[in-house]
């Protein structure tokens, strides 16, 4: 079929298999171009199919020749209907990894559930024996706690008072004002239950209890802080509470891993265009201004550049892992530079529907958004008849 982007709000309903494959190949080429990383050799990636999780899997495999197991929850294709992009990304990753002689297997299902944990533990036991790196990179709006059976839904709200600020509809370029009513206590609890560190700790406990973590094993989860501009809706809002919980969980997990000489880290990453960030009011406008400045300064990074730098310069740099006063790894350091943030804040005041095309990088934002779904890649013939039914080699 001929596959084109079909939009509904912040979501693209279609994905292009050849474009997703090109995206994965581009990331692999980038990693190969940067040279070997003395990293982990057996890696479990929970949330492995898009964004930072996919970039972590690619960096491990093609930077360190690691065997990887990827867990994700994606929609497979059916005739006449495309898969979700993460399915095509994972199919392409496995194809390339197997071609390179690397072990790569994937599990598709709800990583929050006991069943998928069980399946993953059994696969590690059978094929790898143990893992020495666990990446936790889940992005989901809903979680059913396997122990209580309660389904929690996260919300994106400020805490304390209504938040009003500018936002942009990145499809139309229309800058408008948005108001978000504050969260109640239940909203906060639900968001922490979904996006906090509870499930990360459950995974590590399960792996450790069955002796599936190697001596000196490391685990890492991803967080975001961001500037004052977004903090009311992000870091000081419901999501921020969840991130606080995630960051606190790193210390609990480090205690759990003491007997193995292992460690848990949270890496604070930069703002990027993802399906999740596109749905957050204020963030798309912030990102389009940030991109403009970081590109001008020559310090712009996408997911793969961020994770390559995280592995090469922080995690596997041959000495101590540099952290901030709260024990976090900071690869948002270039975004949060004072000069960069001062420029963004100045542009923010000027941003209107009329000025944004010249002061921001809305085109870059749109391009990155379409890239998430496999569109707008050079070297892909989007007019060609494309087979939407693509299989992942390890998923039968």
Swiss-Prot record:
It holds the Pfam family Eno-Rase_FAD_bd. Coiled coil: none annotated. Transmembrane segments: none annotated. Pathway: Lipid metabolism; fatty acid biosynthesis. The active site is at 234 (proton donor). The record marks 74 as: Plays an important role in discriminating NADH against NADPH. It is an enzyme of class 1 (oxidoreductase). GO terms for biological process: fatty acid biosynthetic process. Substrate binds at residue 224. NAD(+) binds at residues 47-52, 73-74, 110-111, 138-139, 243, 272-274. One of its GO terms (molecular function) is enoyl-[acyl-carrier-protein] reductase (NADH) activity. Keywords: Fatty acid biosynthesis, Fatty acid metabolism, Lipid biosynthesis, Lipid metabolism, NAD, Oxidoreductase. Monomer. This is Enoyl-[acyl-carrier-protein] reductase [NADH].
């Amino acid at each position: 079929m001929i596959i084109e982007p079909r939009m509904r709000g912040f979501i693209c309903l279609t994905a292009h298999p050849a474009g997703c494959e090109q995206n994965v190949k581009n990331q692999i080429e980038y990693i190969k171009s940067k040279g070997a990383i003395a990293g982990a050799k057996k890696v479990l990636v929970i949330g492995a199919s898009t964004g930072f999780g996919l970039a972590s899997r690619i960096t491990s495999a093609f930077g360190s020749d690691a065997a990887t197991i990827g867990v994700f929850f994606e929609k497979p294709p059916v005739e006449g209907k495309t898969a979700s992009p993460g399915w095509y990304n994972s199919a392409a990753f496995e194809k390339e990894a197997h071609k390179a002689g690397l072990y790569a297997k994937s599990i598709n299902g709800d990583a929050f559930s006991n069943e998928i944990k069980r399946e993953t533990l059994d696969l590690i036991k059978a094929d790898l024996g143990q893992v020495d790196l666990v990446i936790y990179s889940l992005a989901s709006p809903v979680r059913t706690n396997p122990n209580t059976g309660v389904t929690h839904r996260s919300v994106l709200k400020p805490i304390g008072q209504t938040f009003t600020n500018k936002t942009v509809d990145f499809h139309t370029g229309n800058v408008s004002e948005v108001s978000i009513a504050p969260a109640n206590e239940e909203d906060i609890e639900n968001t922490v239950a979904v996006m906090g560190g509870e499930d990360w700790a459950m995974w590590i406990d399960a792996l450790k209890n069955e002796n599936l973590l190697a001596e000196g094993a490391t685990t890492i989860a991803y967080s975001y802080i961001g500037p004052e501009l977004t903090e009311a809706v992000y870091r000081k809002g419901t999501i921020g509470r969840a991130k606080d919980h995630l960051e606190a969980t790193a210390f609990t997990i480090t205690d759990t891993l003491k007997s193995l000489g292992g460690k848990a880290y949270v890496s604070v990453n930069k703002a990027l265009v993802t399906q999740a960030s596109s749905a957050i009011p204020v963030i798309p406008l912030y990102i389009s201004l940030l991109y403009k400045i970081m590109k001008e300064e020559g310090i712009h990074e996408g997911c793969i550049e961020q994770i390559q730098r995280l592995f090469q310069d922080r995690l596997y740099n041959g000495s101590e892992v540099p952290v901030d006063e709260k024990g976090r790894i900071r690869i948002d350091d270039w975004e949060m530079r004072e000069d960069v943030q001062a420029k963004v804040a100045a542009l923010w005041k000027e941003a209107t529907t009329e000025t944004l095309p010249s002061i921001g990088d809305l085109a870059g934002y749109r391009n990155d958004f379409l890239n998430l779904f496999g569109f707008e890649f050079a070297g892909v013939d989007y007019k060609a008849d494309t087979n939407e039914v693509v299989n992942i080699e390890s998923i039968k």
